C-alpha cells in the first residue's frame, strides 16, 4: 500500500474559474531565494523500521503524522503513528485503524483529529485503500459514496483542517482520481474539482483553516501540475518551470504550499522538494542527504516542514526542517 500523492474550499455552489499561473523558481543565490529562511534538518525514523519512514503532516504543536514499513513486500506492512515533541523513540504513538493489516496516518490538525487510509491486506501490490478519520480516539470510515470504484478500491484522506474538514480523493474504474472533502462533524461529502474543467483527474491533498485546498491534477495536455484552490474559487496552477510534473502536498494558513517536482523521466528522473508562497513563488529545497530524492509533504503555521528522502544506502527516511533565526 503506497501513498497515492501523485495523483478547496469545496464548491457547494458555482465556483469562479479564474486560472492563474504561479511564479518562477528561485534558486540558491538569487534575489528571490534571499527572502526565504535557512532550515535546520533532522532525520526522524521509527526504530521499528529504520529502512522506511515517511512523515506526512505536522501541526502547530509540532506533532507529526507518519508511518513506517514500505508495504511493498509481504511482512513489511505500513504501520501508522504520530510523533510527539520533543522527538525521540519513546515519543512515537502507534495509530492504526482497528482490524487493519496496514495503516497510514497522513494528516492531522491542532485539535488532535487525524486522517489517513487503511488496507485489509499486505500483498505487496494491489492492496485496497479505505479512508478513515479519528476524532477523539473514535475511528470512522470515510469512503466517498460512489458506484464507480476502481478494483481494488483506492480511497484516501490526506489532510484535515481545524474545522475538522478533511480532503482526499478516490479513483474510478478508469483510473481517474476525483477529489473530495469529508466533514468529520456532519458526515457530509462534497466533490472537489477544477472549476475550469471538472472532468480532469484531480486529488485534494491538503486544506487550511480558510478552506484553501492544495493538490494535483492532470492538465488538458496530460501533464501533472499542482494547484491551490482558494476559498474564493480562484484556481492557481502550480507548475515548476522545466519540471516534468509538480505536486502540491501541503498548505498552511499563510497559503505557503509545499510539495515535490520531478525533473527528467525514467531512470534519470529526480524529485526535489519545493515551497511556494503567493508573494515569492517557488523555492527548490532538498534535504541535504537526499539531493534529488526529496518529497516535502507538510507545513505548519511556523513554517516547519516534514517529508522524506532516499539516502545513499537506499533507505527512505523521514525528516523535519525547522526555520532558523
What are these language model-derived features?
Residues 2, 6-10, 14, 25, ...:
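Residue-level hotspots at or immediately adjacent to binding/recognition sites across diverse folds
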Residues 19-25:
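Hydrophobic alpha-helical membrane-insertion segments, chiefly the h-region
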Amino acid at each position: 500500500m503506497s501513498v497515492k500523492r501523485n495523483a478547496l474550499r469545496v464548491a457547494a455552489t458555482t465556483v469562479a474559474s479564474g486560472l492563474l499561473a504561479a511564479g518562477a523558481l528561485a534558486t540558491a543565490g538569487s534575489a528571490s531565494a534571499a527572502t526565504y529562511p535557512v532550515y535546520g534538518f533532522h532525520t526522524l525514523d521509527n526504530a521499528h523500521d529504520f529502512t522506511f519512514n515517511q512523515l506526512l503532516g505536522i501541526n502547530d504543536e509540532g506533532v507529526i503524522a507518519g508511518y513506517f514499513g514500505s508495504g511493498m513486500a509481504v511482512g513489511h506492512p505500513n504501520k501508522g503513528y504520530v510523533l510527539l515533541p520533543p522527538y525521540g523513540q519513546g515519543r512515537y504513538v502507534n495509530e492504526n485503524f482497528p482490524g487493519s493489516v496496514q495503516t497510514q496516518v497522513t494528516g492531522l490538525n491542532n485539535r488532535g483529529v487525524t486522517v489517513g487510509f487503511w488496507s485489509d491486506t499486505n500483498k505487496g501490490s494491489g492492496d485496497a485503500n479505505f479512508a478513515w478519520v479519528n476524532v477523539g480516539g473514535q475511528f470512522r470510515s470515510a469512503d466517498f459514496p460512489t458506484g464507480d470504484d476502481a478494483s481494488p478500491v483506492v480511497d484516501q484522506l490526506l489532510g484535515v483542517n481545524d474545522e475538522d474538514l478533511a480532503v482526499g480523493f478516490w479513483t474510478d474504474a478508469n483510473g481517474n482520481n476525483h477529489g473530495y472533502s469529508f466533514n468529520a462533524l456532519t458526515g457530509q461529502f462534497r466533490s472537489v474539482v477544477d472549476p475550469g474543467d471538472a472532468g480532469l483527474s484531480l486529488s485534494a491533498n491538503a486544506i487550511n483553516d480558510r478552506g484553501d485546498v492544495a493538490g494535483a491534477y492532470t492538465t488538458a495536455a496530460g501533464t501533472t501540475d499542482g494547484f491551490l484552490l482558494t476559498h474564493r474559487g480562484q484556481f492557481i496552477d502550480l507548475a515548476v518551470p522545466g519540471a516534468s510534473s509538480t505536486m502540491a502536498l501541503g498548505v498552511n494558513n499563510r497559503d505557503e504550499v509545499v510539495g515535490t517536482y520531478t525533473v527528467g523521466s525514467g531512470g534519470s528522473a529526480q524529485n526535489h522538494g519545493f515551497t511556494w508562497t503567493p508573494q515569492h513563488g517557488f523555492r527548490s529545497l532538498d534535504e541535504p542527504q537526499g539531493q534529488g530524492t526529496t518529497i516535502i509533504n507538510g507545513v505548519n503555521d511556523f513554517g516547519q516542514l516534514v517529508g522524506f528522502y532516499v539516502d545513499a544506502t537506499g533507505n527512505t527516511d523521514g525528516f523535519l526542517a525547522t526555520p532558523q533565526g
